[in-house]
């Protein structure tokens, strides 16, 4: 945890242990947030209380799993009803979230099929409001303006009203807390929108994207205050 502000921000990554780009993103985010000279980090620490989980699934990561923990469970299908036996990782984090509350949340992943950086939201939750949705779409627009590595044309199909899967963290947090929650997806090989023949989608680009996400969060918060 870090920060002196009252905006409760949760950043968490690698629910699926095979998606190592998520933890590279986290390294970039933590390098930014802990830099005493970084002006974006200083402003964010003044406005926010950050709760950061760099690796939600350390057992699965250590064992070389693709999508599951040591019990063989997909953690991102446990957020509606986590248990100590099947998903202690989610249980611990969600209990901590219940204590702090959540106002902004980003769940960091990688996608094998879509060669792009994109966000997935919470459109199908039962308590959806246009006002909450507008907060998410506004963050999308800010991030798209800040980095050419991000785009909004490609991504997952949007859930129909009332059909969101509440076992997934983004939907659960938006429904449970009224949070502006989102899932960030990155490619495995390269970003077709800005390909790099030498390195593809690299650890360095993951870390730079994290900095752009944090700068976007600061702009998003400043607009909220206006």
Model-derived regions: residue spans:
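Active-site/substrate-binding loop(s) of hydrolase catalytic cores
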Residues: 1-165, 171, 181-186, 192-199
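His/Asp/Glu-rich mid-to-C-terminal helical/loop segments that flank catalytic regions of hydrolases
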Residues: 193-226
């Amino acid at each position: 945890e870090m920060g002196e502000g009252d905006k409760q921000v949760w950043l968490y990554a690698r629910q699926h242990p095979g998606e190592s780009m998520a933890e590279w993103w986290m390294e970039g985010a933590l390098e930014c947030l802990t830099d005493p000279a970084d002006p974006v980090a200083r402003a964010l620490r003044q406005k926010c209380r950050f709760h950061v989980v760099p690796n939600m699934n350390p057992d699965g990561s250590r064992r070389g799993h693709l999508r599951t923990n040591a019990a063989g469970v997909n953690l991102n299908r446990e957020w509606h009803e986590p248990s100590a036996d099947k998903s202690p990782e989610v249980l611990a984090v969600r209990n901590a979230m219940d204590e702090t509350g959540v106002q902004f949340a980003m769940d960091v992943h990688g996608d094998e099929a879509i060669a792009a950086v994109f966000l997935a939201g919470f459109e199908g939750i039962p308590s959806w409001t246009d006002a909450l949705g507008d907060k998410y779409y506004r963050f999308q627009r800010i991030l798209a303006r800040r980095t050419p590595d991000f785009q909004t044309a490609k991504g997952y199909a949007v859930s129909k009203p009332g059909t969101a899967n509440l076992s997934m963290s983004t939907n659960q947090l938006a429904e449970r807390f009224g949070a502006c929650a989102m899932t960030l997806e990155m490619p495995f090989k390269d970003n077709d929108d800005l390909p790099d023949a030498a390195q593809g989608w690299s650890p360095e680009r993951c870390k730079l994207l994290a900095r752009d996400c944090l700068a976007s969060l600061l702009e998003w918060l400043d607009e909220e205050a206006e």
